[in-house]
Every structure is written in C-alpha cells, then in structure tokens.
Amino acid sequence: MSMLPSFGFTQEQVACVCEVLQQGGNLERLGRFLWSLPACDHLHKNESVLKAKAVVAFHRGNFRELYKILESHQFSPHNHPKLQQLWLKAHYVEAEKLRGRPLGAVGKYRVRRKFPLPRTIWDGEETSYCFKEKSRGVLREWYAHNPYPSPREKRELAEATGLTTTQVSNWFKNRRQRDRAAEAKERENTENNNSSSNKQNQLSPLEGGKPLMSSSEEEFSPPQSPDQNSVLLLQGNMGHARSSNYSLPGLTASQPSHGLQAHQHQLQDSLLGPLTSSLVDLGS
C-alpha cells in the first residue's frame, strides 16, 4: 500500500473512511473529507469514493451531479441496490417538485418508465417495483415457509436479496394483507353460494317457490255473509225434506202427492218468514 502524495492516507484507508462515515450518517463530514482529497485521478476513480460522492450529492440535492456520477462509471453489483435507490429517489423528488404534490404508486411507476436505471448500476434483470425477480423469488420461498420472519431473519433476507430490512418487512406485511383479503373474499363467495343453494332448496319444484295449494277448498273460500249462510241452510233443508224417507210432522205415507206439496209450501213459508224479517232488519 503506497501513501498518497502529500495526504498521509493510502487509497484503502480513504475508502474505509468513506464507508465508515456513510454508515454512521455523517454526510456533512463525509462531504468535507471528500473535498479535502488531493487531485489524484486514481483516487477519485475508486468505487468507494465515487459512491460516497453520489451519496453526498443526493444529500445536498445536487441531482445533476448525482446522475453524472452514476452514468459515468461502472459499479460493482453489490453496490447496485444502494445506487438504484439514489437514482429513483432523486427522480421522484424532482417529479414531486414539478407537480407540487407527492407521488402515488402510479406516479412513481411513470417516473421509472421515463427514467430507467442506467446499465452502470443495473445488470439488466427485469425488476418489479424495484425488486428483482430473483429477490422476489427468495422472499416468496421464505414466505411459504414462514410468513412472520424474526428481525434476525429479516436482516439475513435483506443481505441475501440486496434489499434493506425495511423493504423486506414491508414486502412481508403487504403480502400478508393481500392473502388475508383474498381469503376473506373467498369466504364471502362461499357463504353467498351456500345461501343461494339453501334458498333454492326451499323453493317448491312445481310452484316456483310458492307454497302448494291446500286440497281443502274451505281454507281458501271467501267468507260467507249471514244472508248467504241462511239461504244455503234453507236449500239444504228443502233438499233433505224431498229426499228423506221419514214422515214429516202431520203427514202419513198414504197422503196424496198434492198434500205433500202443500205441506212443503207451508214449510217454506215457516222458514222464509223469519229469514225475510232478519234480512229486513239487516238492511235497515
């Protein structure tokens, strides 16, 4: 390791300082450290130094400088996730300033389509909402095994997928919510189908759901008025008198037929008299 001229640090030491300051969130101090570096092309082309410059440029809102750094140098795959976040977040911020409102999911998708990741920080693999299919495959496989990973397991998944722990946590939370919603929808459809089946079974096959008519006409006959009841009673008594084999009061079996007819007229008068009086009273 050779010391940098008039600086006192080796290139590896400079890279280590950049990484430590980034991880500690000391971005202003990192910016001052980068400004103090000597004008050495070999040093300024170091990937850790370039990444540190990109982080400082984003922190200060110097997005043009950020884009220039990311597009001008080929970065190693292990640095792609961090630099991709810087690229996308910078374009999101610029779009929000132009529109004057925060971006939703559709707005962010349009920004990603308009400003695709440069190949210097992207290996060309298709991504879905900034997640590579390979990373999503790892998460899906783990979800099938355990939908509730522990904090330690989330950190391990983040390292394996190149995502942050927050991204991993959000992915699992969103996936659980989608599965619960799908289960609730399926349960609702099943209950609706069962309810429809039960109602169909209760319907009469002949009457389309209407109750079968009773064979007894009396249940559905209209109520008879007092007058109608009296007339029916009279007709029944008269018919009974004609067909009965018993002797009527005051008559013998040997009486002539005209005597029987006269007695029937008397019987009608005796029955119709009170009935007529009742009808007159009801009508008055």
Swiss-Prot record:
Q: Family, per the entry? A: Belongs to the SIX/Sine oculis homeobox family.
Q: Does the keyword Ubl conjugation apply?
A: yes
Protein localization? Nucleus; Cytoplasm
Cite the residue spans of the region called Disordered: 168-271
Give GO MF terms, alphabetically. Answer: DNA-binding transcription factor activity; DNA-binding transcription factor activity, RNA polymerase II-specific; RNA polymerase II cis-regulatory region sequence-specific DNA binding; sequence-specific DNA binding
Q: What is the purpose of this protein?
A: Transcription factor that is involved in the regulation of cell proliferation, apoptosis and embryonic development. Plays an important role in the development of several organs, including kidney, muscle and inner ear. Depending on context, functions as a transcriptional repressor or activator. Lacks an activation domain, and requires interaction with EYA family members for transcription activation. Mediates nuclear translocation of EYA1 and EYA2. Binds the 5'-TCA[AG][AG]TTNC-3' motif present in the MEF3 element in the MYOG promoter and CIDEA enhancer.
In this chain, composition skew of type Basic and acidic residues spans: 179-190
Q: Which residues bind DNA?
A: 124-183
Q: Which SMART domains does the UniProt entry name for this protein? A: HOX (SM00389)
GO cellular component, as recorded: cytoplasm; nucleus; transcription regulator complex
Where does the UniProt entry say this protein principally localizes? nucleus
- Which keywords does this chain's UniProt record carry? Activator, Apoptosis, Cytoplasm, Developmental protein, DNA-binding, Homeobox, Nucleus, Phosphoprotein, Repressor, Transcription, Transcription regulation, Ubl conjugation
Q: Which CDD domains match?
A: homeodomain
Recorded source organism is Lagothrix lagotricha (Brown woolly monkey)
Instruction: Please outline how this chain is modified post-translation.
Output: Phosphorylated during interphase; becomes hyperphosphorylated during mitosis. Hyperphosphorylation impairs binding to promoter elements. Ubiquitinated by the anaphase promoting complex (APC), leading to its proteasomal degradation.
Q: What is this protein called?
A: Homeobox protein SIX1
What is the protein's quaternary organization?
Interacts with DACH1. Interacts with EYA1. Interacts with EYA2. Interacts with CDH1. Interacts with TBX18. Interacts with CEBPA. Interacts with CEBPB. Interacts with EBF2.
Q: A GO biological process this protein is involved in?
A: inner ear development
Q: Where is the composition biased (Polar residues)?
A: 242-271
InterPro entries noted in UniProt: HD (IPR001356), Homeobox_CS (IPR017970), Homeodomain-like_sf (IPR009057), KN_HD (IPR008422), SIX1_SD (IPR031701)
